[in-house]
Regions:
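Helix-adjacent hinge/juxtasegments
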Residues: 80-123
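His-Asp-centered metal-binding catalytic motifs of divalent-metal-dependent phosphohydrolases/nucleases
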Residues: 61-80, 100, 104, 123-129, ...
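Acidic, Mg2+-coordinating active-site segments of isoprenoid diphosphate-utilizing enzymes
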Residues: 72-86, 148-154
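Divalent metal-dependent phosphate-bond-processing catalytic cores, especially two-metal-ion Mg2+/Mn2+ enzymes
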Residues: 3-18, 22, 35-42, 46, ...
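A ubiquitous short alpha-helical element
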Residues: 32-36, 87-93, 133-134
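Acidic catalytic motifs of isoprenoid enzymes
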Residues: 23-30, 34, 75
Length: 202
């Protein structure tokens, strides 16, 4: 809890966050942080939450909840379960969006949230009102910043340069000026710095 934020019901809010974290801690794929393996989707949710609160210390209850469940249990529908084509990728992403929203809705209902709040969280997860809604822009900035800070180096190491540059340009195009300012402060490796420069220079 940060800024002057007060959840509508602190017990319900904390219960929902705890349940999201419990689910994501079941991720069998881990990532080492300071030499300690952490469940990947749990880690992703913590990083996304951190960026949302850094960008918007007074973030709304629905935005905080959405940040914590954006990729809820993503490992349950692996990429390999769809054809390894562009169409297969888009189909996989569309299925995942609905899957995350449904699972998040189940947990929010279990926590005692009303359908109206559940709908607002799911709309953020599904990017339904992006970019019109300010909260959706904060979440998108946070998603892009997690990518730039924690995933860019891995992508650059296994992807053709033009595809990485394209991914960077797409991310940059979705970000607000505030998000871009934070992105330029990140500590990039030499290769990633050069790729970002290339992407921004078009």
């Amino acid at each position: 809890v940060s800024g002057s934020f007060q959840p509508s019901d602190p017990q319900r809010f904390e219960f929902a966050l705890r349940r999201f974290d419990e689910e994501n801690r079941r991720d069998p794929t881990t990532e080492a942080v300071a030499g300690v393996p952490q469940p990947r989707e749990w880690l992703y949710a913590q990083r996304l939450t951190k960026w949302v609160l850094q960008l918007s210390p007074d973030a709304s209850e629905e935005l905080r909840l959405a940040a914590r469940c954006q990729h809820l249990c993503r490992w349950e529908i692996p990429r390999q379960s769809y054809p390894m084509t562009r169409a297969g990728y888009l189909q996989w992403r569309a299925t995942l969006k609905k899957f995350h929203a449904r699972k998040a809705g189940d947990i929010l209902r279990e926590a005692g949230y009303a359908d109206e709040m559940i709908g607002r969280v799911q709309d953020l997860n599904l990017k339904k009102n992006f970019p019109a809604e300010p909260a959706s822009r904060v979440l998108e900035d946070a998603l892009c910043l997690v990518f730039l800070e924690f995933q860019l180096a891995d992508l650059a190491g296994k992807t053709a340069e033009d595809k990485t540059v394209n991914a960077l340009q797409k991310s940059w195009g979705k970000m607000t000026e505030a998000g871009r300012a934070e992105a330029l402060k990140l500590n990039y490796g030499e290769r990633e710095k050069a790729l970002l420069q290339h992407a921004l220079n078009g």
